[in-house]
Amino acid sequence: MGAVSRDDYIALCTELVEHDRRYYVLNQPTISDYSYDVKMRELQEIEVQHPEWKVSWSPTMYLGDRPSGQFPVVPHSSPMLSIANVYSLQELEEFFSRTEKLLGYSPGYSLELKIDGIAVAIRYEKRLFAQALSRGNGVKGEDITANVSTIRSLPMRLPQEAPEDLEVRGEVFLSYEAFEELNACQREQGKLEFANPRNAAGGTLKLLSSKEAAKRKLDLSVYGLITDQKKRSHFENLQLCSQWGFFVAGMPKQCRSRQDVVERIREIEEMRAALPMAIDGVVIKVDNIAYQDRLGLTSKHYRWAIAYKYAPERAETILEDIVVQVGKTGILTPVAELAPVFLSGSRVSRASLYNQDEIEKKDIRIGDSVYVEKGGEVIPKIVGINLAKRSLESEPWKMPSLCPVCHEPVVKEKVSVRCVNPLCSGGMLEKICFFASKSALNIDHLGEKVVTKLFEVGLISSCSDIFALAEEDLKQVPGFKDRSIQNLLASIAGAKKVALDRLLTALSIPFVGSSGAIALADHFGTLDKVIEASLDELMSIEGIGPKVAASIVAFFSKHENREEIRRMQELGVQVLSKQSDKEAPLQGKVFVLTGTLQQMTRTQAEERIRCLGGKVSSSVSKSTYAVIAGSEAGGKLKKAQDLGLSIWNESELLRILDAKSVS
């Protein structure tokens, strides 16, 4: 690692916080586990060398799974930590040596599959299923009981030989078969497909409707048991779980020696492709429970366990073409069109090529037979070329000098090639899709396919056009029915009240992600102050370096960007100010939403309540301040009435929100 400045440190923190959010909250990771671990180790090394730089929000301080806000948060019975990863047999030997040095002798080990899913804790009371929690930050997790209860392989009642009260920990996942069924359903409904089974499982556990979750065929494999009556060994505990009706995947095995462990690792790697679910490695644990207790844990990991990660699965196929896409900030990205191949449980027909430099470095050519892998089972990429199969007539590929969409000249930057035409329809389509997406304004019923259709027929050509859509215009679009039109217009109306950080993210300011947008909103409070901010003022904000600050100033200095914001405001968009705890009128008050809202989505309502300091829970209790009852409200409304709680309709909620929240 070369010389590092504090700005470099802050930039790395910010990058990892964003990766944590994408992995744990959005279930949309963009880098491999290995790349993440390398960056995390670099961050830890910097903090050791420069402890005075360490910020309170450093990703080394938590596990990354921040609450989504949709479910109540509950403490774990004991820390639910992650397991450290190793990627080579040499690193595994270091784990063995470290463990044996701490104990003073060589313990036995158990070995099990590392399923690529979502970790959960499941509690039983009087042998009946009682509660399920996500891992969360390791100390507290979200109550996902309703969605976990839809897992058919999860026993609702345990046999008499099981202890009355116990907790199991396991991995929620989707089999390859269930994953393919789900994506087929997504395609039929015109929705985006999930990138991989883990993303699909994570998204399912976050659903607000357990009826929808039940349709997705989640599965659960148990990997741990917490009870006063547990056996002396971890392996025996897993056998007990299996006897009580839990699914324990992949033949856990006791290993007497290091060599036994290595042999088993190789056996599983050979059978990996034939397994019915995605795995990304194996977990090795000290088998004796008393030894586990002696070894203890760190702030992030168990000392008695390690995950050995396999190299990503690889396949060979033909590179049929290279197409160039224009992104939301105008960057041109080459994409490989591949002869379809099955890899890591899904059909792969495209792969990212990143940029011209990457293509030149690997000398990738159209017609090549290439090796493709999913980095950390996330995004397919080309990792090599079978030169023995290369045609003598193949030629090096070059990035076009004109934008493939608007045909204007492109500009070569340090690494990227960018179309700087503000009217380029290619970049604008991507920008509008992102603006409406879950990561930005989260406008229901306005997914990528709908945006593309509206763009192609000329109804929208900018983000602000979304708010000008009218019923009579939409009726002219083939395939749009009355109900879908009403749903879309209702979602757009709800999106007109938008939190400041959400809007800043949605504007696609170069180098400003969600973390930067939150920092700007926290510091300035209003949109006008952000727009008028100077370079020096921006650079005074922790996490905003010179490059990002210059990009923000440049963005808001452009007439077309200011005009776009002005038009949004003319069309009714109101930016919710970021209020301090002292000013927040709903500070500390807990709300529960039930039934269907008509004028905004539930997510939009929750966000507006939080902007005013309120909290949103999924369950009614004596601490609930008010229950917001929409149409078809069910059991939560009845419970609120029984407890004598305040019950508001949607109009009452909107009256409070509109009076208090608009800057």
UniProtKB/Swiss-Prot annotation:
One of its GO terms (biological process) is DNA replication. It is an enzyme of class 6 (ligase). Its cofactor is Mg(2+); Mn(2+). It catalyses: NAD(+) + (deoxyribonucleotide)n-3'-hydroxyl + 5'-phospho-(deoxyribonucleotide)m = (deoxyribonucleotide)n+m + AMP + beta-nicotinamide D-nucleotide. Keywords: DNA damage, DNA repair, DNA replication, Ligase, Magnesium, Manganese, Metal-binding, NAD, Zinc. Zn(2+) binds at residues 403, 406, 419, 424. GO terms for molecular function: DNA binding; DNA ligase (NAD+) activity; metal ion binding. Residues 581-663 form the BRCT domain. The active site is at residue 114. It holds the Pfam family DNA_ligase_OB. NAD(+) binds at residues 33-37, 82-83, 112, 135, 171, 285, 309. It comes from the Bacteria. GO terms for cellular component: cytosol. The keyword DNA repair applies. Belongs to the NAD-dependent DNA ligase family. LigA subfamily. HAMAP family: DNA_ligase_A. DNA ligase that catalyzes the formation of phosphodiester linkages between 5'-phosphoryl and 3'-hydroxyl groups in double-stranded DNA using NAD as a coenzyme and as the energy source for the reaction. It is essential for DNA replication and repair of damaged DNA. This is DNA ligase. It comes from Chlamydia trachomatis serovar D (strain ATCC VR-885 / DSM 19411 / UW-3/Cx).
